[in-house]
């Protein structure tokens, strides 16, 4: 048995990790109304993307990997001698990536494809990839890995803030926000992932209060966890994310592992300006 681990591009793993563990990536993409396309990779300058989004008159559209893209990756790994492929995907609640990866796996012969719905995005999705790789190295079988990731998912989550709900509403990536329409003037929405979907959690008066709310909600959840990895995931307001990262490093118990990451184009397109996330995993994740 030889097991590969792959993912889609919204896990936002560093190129060093991709190269070190030979992780195959199925890229998602973003397209603007003038035809400008950003296919996700570590070569994209995220500042250029945010500038383009700010100057665009319409919300960009996102595209999941085509089934053919998944099939090509699976066949390549099969031809390299892999018998099984663990595939970690962006939440099925906001993308069809999981469904297309699963369907492609049903169409490929000679290799067993095990698709896993992270029900999250960005580097929290990436944590499942890194955990799966660690378990492959330790000799676990595919079903044992999927079972462990499923258990890990019960102790994993994320909260988000954005400047407004415009992008999320127009892209259809938020659930249950209708009652908030027209009520967010001078208010900041606090959101969370619940069962793979982004839902409204709370409205607060200022960005400062919104960031404090992120921190309080997450730290209240993880206070009884034996192990914790926290992720500050930053958007285009660089200083806010850096300040929260430093504060958590200073404030959290030594048992906590605090890491920093950034949103890539696809998730940034859904969130719009001012996106900032704080995610948690009830494990110590190997990040190198």
UniProtKB/Swiss-Prot annotation:
Which keywords annotate this record? Lipid-binding
Report the domain of life of the source organism. Bacteria
An MF annotation (GO) of this entry = lipid binding
Q: Where does hexadecanoate bind?
A: 62, 95
> Would the keyword Glycosyltransferase be found if you checked this record's keyword annotation?
no
Membrane-traversing stretches: none
What InterPro entries does the annotation carry?
DegV, DegV_C, DegV_domain_contain
Residues covered by the DegV domain:
3-282
What job does the chain carry out? May bind long-chain fatty acids, such as palmitate, and may play a role in lipid transport or fatty acid metabolism.
Recorded protein name is DegV domain-containing protein SACOL0812
Write down the species. Staphylococcus aureus (strain COL)
């Amino acid at each position: 048995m030889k097991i590969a681990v792959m993912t889609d591009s919204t896990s936002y793993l560093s190129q060093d990790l991709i190269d070190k563990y030979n992780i195959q990536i199925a890229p998602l993409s973003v397209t603007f109304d003038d035809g400008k396309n950003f296919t996700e990779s570590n070569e994209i300058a995220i500042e250029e993307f945010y500038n383009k989004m700010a100057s665009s008159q319409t919300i960009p559209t996102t595209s999941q990997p085509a089934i053919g893209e998944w099939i090509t990756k699976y066949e390549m790994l099969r031809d390299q001698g892999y018998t099984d492929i663990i595939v970690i995907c962006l939440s099925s609640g906001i993308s069809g990536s999981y469904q297309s990866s699963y369907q492609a796996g049903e169409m490929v012969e000679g290799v067993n494809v095990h698709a896993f719905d992270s029900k999250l995005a960005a580097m929290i999705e990436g944590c499942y990839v890194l955990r799966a790789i660690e378990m492959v190295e330790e000799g676990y079988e595919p079903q044992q890995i999927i079972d462990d990731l499923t258990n890990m998912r019960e102790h994993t989550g994320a909260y988000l803030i954005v400047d407004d709900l415009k992008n999320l509403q127009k892209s259809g990536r938020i659930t249950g926000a209708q009652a908030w329409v027209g009520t967010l003037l001078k208010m900041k929405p606090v959101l969370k992932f619940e069962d793979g979907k982004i839902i409204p959690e709370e409205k607060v008066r200022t960005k400062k209060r919104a960031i404090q709310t992120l921190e309080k909600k997450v730290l209240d959840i993880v206070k009884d966890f034996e192990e914790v990895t926290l992720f500050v995931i930053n958007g285009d307001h660089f200083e806010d994310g850096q300040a929260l990262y430093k504060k958590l490093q200073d404030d959290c118990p030594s048992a906590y592992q605090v890491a920093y990451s950034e949103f890539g184009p696809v998730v940034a397109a859904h969130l719009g300006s001012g996106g900032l996330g704080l995610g948690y995993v009830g494990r110590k994740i190997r990040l190198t």
